């Protein structure tokens, strides 16, 4: 969707070139490994927007709409009621931001506000007050990065900065409202995905510009990285989430759009392909609620193709 270096492609050029030279493989998924079911769709189509869970509700801010415009709107999904509502819009529109929940708040880091360079600004959203508050900016402006919470701190990893694709890794301390730079990711990439399992942050896939199968894990306690088994299918523009101590990598983009759902088991350092997404997508959000994973929005074609799709995956137990 975004060419390395921050250049936003037009819809027609993006569709023609997509974002890599890898085509989705034709090998088959394992349909009996996990179950998918449809849930209530988003109120409006969007893509390039991660999501985050706070107290039984999934918050989906910003992204591109169906016309390819950057939006500031916030949609909120009540998991128990299977119903979407709108919340207070962000102070400014964002696409390709990092989104993470921490301490009952939703943090939005970086992203693009338009076709210009990446932003470093950070906001948090208070669900109880329905208010957005600016926080200290990231040291390095970035978009198409990942943002996760581990050990009470927020990590912003990889993405596109003003000089191109980076492996930058910065940590935010909410108590002091300060960022620090820690050990960089060994493989710089953007349009990557990440999830936390135990004391490690697993970072998977991405591109720079070709698609990566790379899986690397960051250990905050030792400020070090581990290189792990490659994902079977190299993908950028994917989403990831953890459930039952395993990592799941969904979708992605090449000249086509991936349906793939691949599972990584840290105990064996091994991958397997499980039940594919019913709707192939890229640039979506993935959020774990209980044992299930909700995969929300995203583009159904390479480039622009925002959708309202909300599908729930329940892994095997």
Task: Tell what function each PLM region has.
Residues 1-8:
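Bacterial N-terminal signal peptides that target proteins for export
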Residues 15-18:
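C-terminal motif of bacterial Sec signal peptides marking the signal peptidase cleavage site
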Residues 20-317:
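Kelch-like beta-propeller repeat domains
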């Amino acid at each position: 969707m975004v060419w390395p270096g921050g250049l936003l492609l037009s819809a027609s050029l993006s569709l023609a070139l997509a974002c890599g030279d890898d085509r989705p493989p034709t090998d088959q998924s394992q349909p009996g490994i996990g179950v998918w079911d449809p849930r209530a769709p988003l109120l409006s189509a969007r893509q390039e927007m991660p999501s985050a869970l706070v107290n039984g509700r999934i918050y989906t801010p910003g992204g591109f709409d169906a016309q390819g415009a950057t939006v500031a709107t916030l949609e909120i999904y009540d998991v128990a009621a299977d119903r979407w509502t709108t919340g207070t819009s962000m102070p400014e529109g964002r696409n390709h931001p990092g989104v993470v929940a921490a301490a009952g708040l939703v943090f939005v880091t970086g992203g693009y506000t338009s076709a210009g360079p990446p932003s470093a600004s950070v906001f948090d959203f208070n669900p109880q007050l329905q208010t957005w508050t600016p926080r200290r900016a990231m040291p390095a402006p970035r978009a198409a990065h990942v943002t996760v919470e581990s050990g009470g701190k927020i990590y912003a990893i990889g993405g596109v900065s003003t000089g191109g694709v980076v492996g930058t890794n910065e940590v935010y301390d909410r108590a002091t409202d300060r960022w620090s730079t820690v050990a960089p990711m060994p493989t710089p990439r953007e349009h990557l995905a990440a999830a936390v399992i135990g004391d490690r942050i697993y970072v998977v896939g991405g591109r720079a510009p070709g698609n990566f199968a790379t899986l690397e894990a960051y250990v905050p306690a030792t400020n070090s990285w581990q290189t792990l088994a490659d994902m079977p299918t190299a993908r950028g523009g994917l989403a990831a989430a953890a459930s039952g101590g395993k990592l799941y990598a969904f979708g992605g983009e090449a000249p086509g759009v991936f349906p793939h759902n691949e599972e990584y088991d840290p105990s064996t350092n091994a991958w397997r392909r499980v039940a594919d997404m019913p709707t192939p997508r890229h640039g979506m959000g993935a959020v774990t609620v209980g044992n299930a994973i909700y995969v929300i929005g995203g583009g159904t074609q390479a480039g622009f193709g925002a959708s309202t799709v909300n599908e729930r995956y329940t892994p095997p137990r």
